A protein has these predicted regions:
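Signal peptide processing junction and immediate N-terminal pro/mature segment
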Residues: 32-42
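Bacterial N-terminal signal peptides that target proteins for export
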Residues: 3-22
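Helix-capping and short linker residues that terminate individual alpha-solenoid repeat units
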Residues: 80, 104, 120-124, 147, ...
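Bacterial N-terminal signal peptides
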Residues: 19-31
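Asp-box/WD-like beta-propeller blade repeats and closely related beta-sheet repeat scaffolds
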Residues: 152-184
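CBM-like carbohydrate-recognition segments
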Residues: 41-90, 97-118, 122-136, 142-157, ...
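Extended ligand-binding clefts on enzyme/binding-domain cores
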Residues: 177-181, 188-294, 300-312, 324-355, ...
Length: 392
């Protein structure tokens, strides 16, 4: 935080404190991912997290499951008596559902179901806000396993009302790139569950409105939001946030997994997925992980685990489902997974997860937050599916 000079003190007559307080409050309310994600259970950053676990990062099923089990058990112990509809928990719920299958541990899926039932399968309070729709991804996964119309009722009611709002490319509904993970898979998932294409068509229109605003057709990367379109790193390169692009890659993977193969717009999603995958593979660090700022790695010496985990998840999903060429991406996935496993502490904490934010930043090695753990568990499931002992 900068220090104001006496002449420009926040409490001087030229800058009344009440005006600044009001401005700060407005910015806090308007900023997605910052205003509501104040849940102390979402994570922490201890100064002394203890020793690393020194687990094997080999792409062998037993080693992958061992790493996933260590992380899942640690996180479960911290949240098992807690529930939330906050966006920070959406990746964790998805990760727990994946871990339940990978590890044959029903307690993880039972926990997610308990949360959904507690909230009557509802969503967050902001009706049209992507962050407050994200948890529905987990409800839709559970619905696919045990269909019950009551599980879809809150989502359908909210989305049917939203369908009646005209599109406005000048005021994008999903105006920050993280939103492409939060909301689109819920729309695609609801379309699949109900066999009603209107939900998918709506998602498709909104996706490309956001893409037109934030996607760089030269760098094949997304700016976090329009305020970052002309910001640069210290080395002069454009500023692209690794977790923001990880959100998008994971969102693409999840949308493609739910979208019919014959959907007319599917080739556009595949093209963007291929473009981003190739570019991100070029930017991978020597340790297998990505830095918080993608185009100025030297400015960010620590790896960033949450963005890296989302990227590894998306790449592994692409290989698993024949969307990406295994020969071209297996090395990047292998190195990425080894790097992620190296971030596990002896007690199961997953470190180097950047706290909630909107741009590259600093954090201590032990920083751990639920969205990063969820991304890691999602990656574990897809990496295990293409591991050395699996038929290909």
């Amino acid at each position: 935080m900068s220090t104001a000079s006496p002449a420009m003190s926040p409490f001087s007559p030229r800058r009344p404190a009440c005006v600044l307080c009001l401005l700060a409050a407005v910015l806090l309310v308007l900023s997605p991912g910052l205003a509501r994600a104040d849940d102390s259970m979402a994570g922490d950053a201890p100064a002394h997290p203890g020793p690393r676990a020194q687990l094997s990062g080999a792409l062998r099923p037993a080693d992958i499951r061992r790493a996933a089990a260590r992380v899942a058990a640690w996180q479960y112990a911290r949240v098992q008596d807690h529930d939330s509809l906050d966006w920070t928990y959406a990746p964790l719920y998805l990760g727990f559902l994946s871990a339940a299958d990978l590890l044959h541990e029903p307690r993880y899926a039972d926990y997610v179901r308990k949360v959904g039932e507690h909230y009557d399968w509802g969503l967050g309070p902001r009706v049209h806000h992507a962050d407050d729709q994200a948890v529905a991804q987990a409800w839709l996964v559970l619905y696919a396993r045990t269909p019950d119309p009551a599980m879809l009722k809150p989502l359908r009611e909210r989305y049917d009302a939203q369908l009646r709002i005209p599109d406005d490319p000048q005021r994008p509904l999903w105006w920050w790139c993280d939103a492409l993970f939060m909301a689109p898979p819920t729309w695609a998932g609801l379309a699949k569950a109900t066999h009603e294409s209107a939900y998918l068509d709506y998602m498709d229109r909104q996706w490309w409105i956001t893409s037109a605003l934030l996607y760089d057709p030269v760098e094949y990367l997304y700016s976090r939001d329009a305020s970052y379109l002309h910001q640069h790193e210290r080395n002069g390169e454009k500023l692209f946030w690794s977790r923001g692009n990880g959100w998008v890659m994971a969102g693409l993977a999840r949308v493609l997994s739910l979208m019919p193969n014959d959907y007319p717009q599917r080739p556009r999603y595949l093209q963007q997925f291929h473009e981003m995958a190739a570019r991100l593979a070029q930017l991978q660090g020597k340790d297998g992980l990505w830095r918080a700022g993608l185009l100025d790695a030297a400015a960010y010496p620590r790896p960033e685990t949450s963005g890296s985990a989302f990227i590894v998840y998306a790449l592994a999903w692409g290989v698993h489902h024949g969307v990406l060429d295994a020969a071209a991406y297996r090395s990047a996935i292998n190195r990425g997974w080894r790097g992620l496993v190296g971030e596990i502490y002896a007690d199961g904490r997953l470190g180097d997860i950047q706290p909630i934010g909107a741009a590259p930043g600093d954090y201590p090695p032990g920083a751990s937050y639920v969205y990063g753990v969820g991304a890691f568990l999602l990656a574990a499931g897809e990496v295990e599916a293409i591991s050395e002992a699996k038929p290909r």
